[in-house]
């Protein structure tokens, strides 16, 4: 049985209020899937207010014009586990170093990793704009 957590419910109420009152003014501008508010609700429901708050803040900080966006499930959820199983190249352990493109490790030169480099344009791509080209007009 789940216990009543008043701070968590207060935070959930805040996010739902944001979605109802503020979010419609901006339209669909989130670069991530699920949207930042959906991510926040899911994090609060799964982890509670104390563990979810840093996750939500970090997610909001990442949602900026210089970010590529993409699928970003809440850590510790079945969706995140399934994503890691289907896409092991996106998971990083705490001890794994950041990829150094100056060494000759062939794993660093895989197409999926090259595309994650800011400013990288695939030679076969017709896109010449900024990474936020899929956001639409602001």
Curated annotation (Swiss-Prot):
One of the record's GO cellular component terms: plasma membrane
Ranges of biased composition (kind: Basic and acidic residues): 81-113
UniProt entry keywords in alphabetical sequence: Cell membrane, Membrane
Highest rank taxon of the organism: Bacteria
Subcellular location: Cell membrane
Topological type in the membrane: Peripheral membrane protein
Keyword Calcium belongs to the record: no
Main localization category: membrane
Pfam families: YidD
Family: Belongs to the UPF0161 family.
Name this polypeptide is given: Putative membrane protein insertion efficiency factor
């Amino acid at each position: 049985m789940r216990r009543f957590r008043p701070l968590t419910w207060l935070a959930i109420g805040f996010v739902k209020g944001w979605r109802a009152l503020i979010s419609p003014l901006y339209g669909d501008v989130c670069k991530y899937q699920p949207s930042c508010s959906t991510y926040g609700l899911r994090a609060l429901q799964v982890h509670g207010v104390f563990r979810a708050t840093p996750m939500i803040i970090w997610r909001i900080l990442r949602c900026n014009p210089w970010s590529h966006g993409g699928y970003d499930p809440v850590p510790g959820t079945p969706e995140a586990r399934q994503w890691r199983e289907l896409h092991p190249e996106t998971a990083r352990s705490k001890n794994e170093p950041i990829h150094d493109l100056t060494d000759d490790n062939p794993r660093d030169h895989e197409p999926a990793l090259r595309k994650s480099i800011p400013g990288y344009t695939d030679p076969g791509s017709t896109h010449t704009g900024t990474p936020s080209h899929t956001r639409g007009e602001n």
